[in-house]
Amino acid sequence: MAENSVKKVVLAYSGGLDTSVILRWLQTERGAEVVTFTADLGQGEELEPARRKAEMFGVKEIFVEDLRETFVKDFVFPMFRANALYEGQYLLGTSIARPLIAQRQIEIAEAVGADAVAHGATGKGNDQVRFELAYYALKPDVKVVAPWREWSLTSRTKLLEFAEAHQIPIAKDKRGEAPFSVDANLLHSSSEGKILEDPAQAPDEIVYQRTISPEAAPDVVTEISIDFAQGDAVALNGVALSPATLLTRLNELGRDNGIGRLDLVENRFVGMKSRGVYETPGGTILLAAHRAIESITLDREAAHLKDSLMPRYAELIYNGFWFSPERRMLQALIDASQNSVTGRVRLKLYKGNVIVAGRESPNSLYSARMVTFEDDEGAYNQQDAAGFIKLNALRLRLGGAIGRRGGAL
């Protein structure tokens, strides 16, 4: 991209030091008109200071939006219908937030006549990929500015010097290197970098901001129930709640019971491994509950097929392919599987553990009469099992006979 080819750019703006430097850099080095977009995804920060700071920089068009309900309803819940876990552990809290931010940037760009969008992701991480794949999927001709890949501010010292030269306020705690970086939204909080870069060293308790330690959690069990309708959680303890309100309440319950901590070394899409410390209190509870209600409402082969597709689905989200045709195809299959996933799950929360205490559904496929160890009154003829076993053993018997004669597998 030519240095001054951008005329008007929509910046994903947090109001923090890094994106404030980016804002000023776009104005001074690129000569671009900047439109700021700040999204409330439940990160727990006051966002009006971002508006005031943008005004201080002379920004005329400022968007500060509460997207918590949209985030949970249209992004988090569809993902949880799949029980998505990246590399078997990560609940994708950062990954699932990027498509919504990118989508709103593009919508705003089209509304205000901007020819470009910009983000504050570095050139080493996954977020640059997630943002830009979404941008190009939604607006193929959009121009993208990624300052961390372009500018000469390659050190913290240079960043601070630029900030001071352009009268960008610097909080006292930003003048030194932060001990680790934090990204947060309503689903999770992630901490990476600096003191966490050695995977052999346990994270200090100061890293955890959304959960108390399991050791410090109450010595009494917290009992709750979650109601599901077609795969989505709709009520907590019998009280109907909006998606964001329900997840917020689950976060509080998880926090108080030391639930949802994860120390993970993951494989980034860009090729390197990274260590992250994640807190997903409400999501951890929700995942356990969703799997429990599926256990009685999904057909065996449907459940197994869904489980076999989950790693691919999770990988697509992690790598930034939310708006890809293959993710949409998988989502259609997953959503179809949830038509019968309705009912109630009872849980016990205790010192970092989520324990399923019961599950019930009007669509339950579980037959106590069929599986009983007592007299089933003819519900199941055990003699039928002999033919079932013989048919399934046929290929094994044939292979075994060849094997005894020295044949290959």
UniProtKB/Swiss-Prot annotation:
<keyword id="KW-0067">ATP-binding</keyword>
<feature type="binding site">
    <location>
        <begin position="12"/>
        <end position="20"/>
    </location>
    <ligand>
        <name>ATP</name>
    </ligand>
</feature>
<dbReference type="InterPro" id="IPR023434">
    <property type="entry name" value="Arginosuc_synth_type_1_subfam"/>
</dbReference>
<feature type="binding site">
    <location>
        <position position="122"/>
    </location>
    <ligand>
        <name>L-aspartate</name>
    </ligand>
</feature>
<dbReference type="GO" id="GO:0005737">
    <property type="term" value="C:cytoplasm"/>
</dbReference>
<dbReference type="Pfam" id="PF00764">
    <property type="entry name" value="Arginosuc_synth"/>
</dbReference>
<feature type="binding site">
    <location>
        <position position="278"/>
    </location>
    <ligand>
        <name>L-citrulline</name>
    </ligand>
</feature>
<dbReference type="GO" id="GO:0006526">
    <property type="term" value="P:L-arginine biosynthetic process"/>
</dbReference>
<dbReference type="GO" id="GO:0000053">
    <property type="term" value="P:argininosuccinate metabolic process"/>
</dbReference>
<keyword id="KW-0055">Arginine biosynthesis</keyword>
<feature type="binding site">
    <location>
        <position position="90"/>
    </location>
    <ligand>
        <name>L-citrulline</name>
    </ligand>
</feature>
<dbReference type="InterPro" id="IPR048267">
    <property type="entry name" value="Arginosuc_syn_N"/>
</dbReference>
<feature type="binding site">
    <location>
        <position position="266"/>
    </location>
    <ligand>
        <name>L-citrulline</name>
    </ligand>
</feature>
<dbReference type="InterPro" id="IPR018223">
    <property type="entry name" value="Arginosuc_synth_CS"/>
</dbReference>
<feature type="binding site">
    <location>
        <position position="190"/>
    </location>
    <ligand>
        <name>L-citrulline</name>
    </ligand>
</feature>
<comment type="subunit">
    <text>Homotetramer.</text>
</comment>
<feature type="binding site">
    <location>
        <position position="126"/>
    </location>
    <ligand>
        <name>L-citrulline</name>
    </ligand>
</feature>
<dbReference type="Pfam" id="PF20979">
    <property type="entry name" value="Arginosuc_syn_C"/>
</dbReference>
<dbReference type="InterPro" id="IPR001518">
    <property type="entry name" value="Arginosuc_synth"/>
</dbReference>
<dbReference type="GO" id="GO:0000050">
    <property type="term" value="P:urea cycle"/>
</dbReference>
<feature type="binding site">
    <location>
        <position position="39"/>
    </location>
    <ligand>
        <name>ATP</name>
    </ligand>
</feature>
<feature type="binding site">
    <location>
        <position position="95"/>
    </location>
    <ligand>
        <name>L-citrulline</name>
    </ligand>
</feature>
<comment type="pathway">
    <text>Amino-acid biosynthesis; L-arginine biosynthesis; L-arginine from L-ornithine and carbamoyl phosphate: step 2/3.</text>
</comment>
<feature type="binding site">
    <location>
        <position position="181"/>
    </location>
    <ligand>
        <name>L-citrulline</name>
    </ligand>
</feature>
<dbReference type="InterPro" id="IPR048268">
    <property type="entry name" value="Arginosuc_syn_C"/>
</dbReference>
<dbReference type="InterPro" id="IPR014729">
    <property type="entry name" value="Rossmann-like_a/b/a_fold"/>
</dbReference>
<keyword id="KW-0963">Cytoplasm</keyword>
<dbReference type="InterPro" id="IPR024074">
    <property type="entry name" value="AS_cat/multimer_dom_body"/>
</dbReference>
<dbReference type="GO" id="GO:0004055">
    <property type="term" value="F:argininosuccinate synthase activity"/>
</dbReference>
<dbReference type="GO" id="GO:0005524">
    <property type="term" value="F:ATP binding"/>
</dbReference>
<feature type="binding site">
    <location>
        <position position="127"/>
    </location>
    <ligand>
        <name>L-aspartate</name>
    </ligand>
</feature>
<feature type="binding site">
    <location>
        <position position="126"/>
    </location>
    <ligand>
        <name>L-aspartate</name>
    </ligand>
</feature>
<comment type="similarity">
    <text>Belongs to the argininosuccinate synthase family. Type 1 subfamily.</text>
</comment>
<feature type="binding site">
    <location>
        <position position="130"/>
    </location>
    <ligand>
        <name>L-citrulline</name>
    </ligand>
</feature>
<keyword id="KW-0028">Amino-acid biosynthesis</keyword>
<keyword id="KW-0436">Ligase</keyword>
<feature type="binding site">
    <location>
        <position position="120"/>
    </location>
    <ligand>
        <name>ATP</name>
    </ligand>
</feature>
<protein>
    <recommendedName>
        <fullName>Argininosuccinate synthase</fullName>
        <ecNumber>6.3.4.5</ecNumber>
    </recommendedName>
</protein>
<keyword id="KW-0547">Nucleotide-binding</keyword>
